[in-house]
Amino acid sequence: MTDSSYDAQAVRSWLQGLQTHIADTLGAFDGTPFATDAWQRAPGEKLRGGGYTRILEGGKFFERAGIGFSDVAGDALPGSASAARPQLAGRGFEAMGVSLVLHPHNPHCPTVHMNVRLLIATKPGEEPVFWFGGGMDLTPYYGYEEDARHFHRTCRDALQPYGADLYPSFKRWCDEYFFLKHRNEARGIGGIFFDDFSAPGFDQSFAMLKSVGDAFLKAYLPIVEKRRNIPYGQAERDFQAYRRGRYVEFNLVFDRGTLFGLQSGGRTESILMSMPPVVNWRYNWHPEPGTPEARLYSDFLVPREWV
C-alpha cells in the first residue's frame, strides 16, 4: 500500500462496464431484465457520490439477484476499513466497487457472492494510499463435488498469471473469512478473498482485479446451467431457507463490506440487497444422519483442497 500512483477513472470505467455485462448476461439467462435504481447522495449527507443498483426479484430462475456499483467518498475512513491500518484512521477516503449476490429459487443451485473494489485513503499534505480487495465465494445448499471443483479451478486459473502463490493464499483467506465463529461453521465452500492488495503496483494489482471480475460468469454459470432443472420439493426449500439464515447472520455480524457501508452512512437499501428474500431459523435443528442435508455439513462445510 505504499505506491501512491493510481488511475481511479480507469477502475471506475471498468467497474461500470463489468456491472452492465453481468446484469445483461444474467438477465438473459433468467429471461427477466434487471431493473436499474440510480442513486445519488444528497448535499450535506455523511457521504458524497452515488451509484447504480441493478436488481431482479421474483424472476424465473433468480428469486433475488442484486448487482451494485457504488462510488462514494467521505471525510473519515470507517473503523471496519482502518482496523488493520491504524495509521490511516481518520483519513478521507474514496471507495468504489461492484458487489453482487445471487439467490436462485432452486435449492440445488448455489447462492454466490462476488465483489471487486478499490479504496483510496487521502490526507492533505500526504500521498494518497490505495488498495484493492475482493473475491468470490459459493454457498451451496446441496453439495456437488464437481461444482466445487469447477468454481475453485476457475478462481485458480484467474489468479495464475499473477503468481502461483495467490490462489492458495486467497483460498485460505476465504476459508478463514467466511466462517461463522459463533456457529463454528463455514458459510459455504469458499473460493477466494483478498484485501489490502497493492504490493505489485497499480497496473499489476488492477490487472489481477480485472481477471477476478471477468472470471465470475465462467465460474458460476456452468454450475447453474447444469442444476437449474433438477426437481425439488418443499423439504428442499425449507432446508434452503434454514441455511440462508446463516447467510444473514454472517452478513450482519462479520461482513466487512456490510459493516463498512453501514458505519460510513452508506445507502441501506443497496447494502442490504444481498439479503435472501425468504429465510427461517429453527431452534437447535440438526439434519438426519445419512441425508443429503447432513452431507452438506460433513463433506462441504469443511476446509478442503478442491483443486
UniProtKB/Swiss-Prot annotation:
Identify the species of origin: Paraburkholderia phytofirmans (strain DSM 17436 / LMG 22146 / PsJN) (Burkholderia phytofirmans)
The active-site annotation reads H113 (proton donor)
UniProt lists the family membership as follows:
Belongs to the aerobic coproporphyrinogen-III oxidase family.
Q: Name one Pfam family in it.
A: Coprogen_oxidas
- Give the protein's cofactors: a divalent metal cation
Stated EC number for the protein is 1.3.3.3
Gene name, per UniProt, is hemF
What's its catalytic activity?
A: coproporphyrinogen III + O2 + 2 H(+) = protoporphyrinogen IX + 2 CO2 + 2 H2O
Tell me which residues are marked as the site Important for dimerization. H182
Sequence positions that bind a divalent metal cation: H103, H113, H152, H182
User: Which stretches of sequence are listed as region Important for dimerization?
Assistant: 247-282
Pathways per UniProt = Porphyrin-containing compound metabolism; protoporphyrin-IX biosynthesis; protoporphyrinogen-IX from coproporphyrinogen-III (O2 route): step 1/1
Entry protein name: Oxygen-dependent coproporphyrinogen-III oxidase
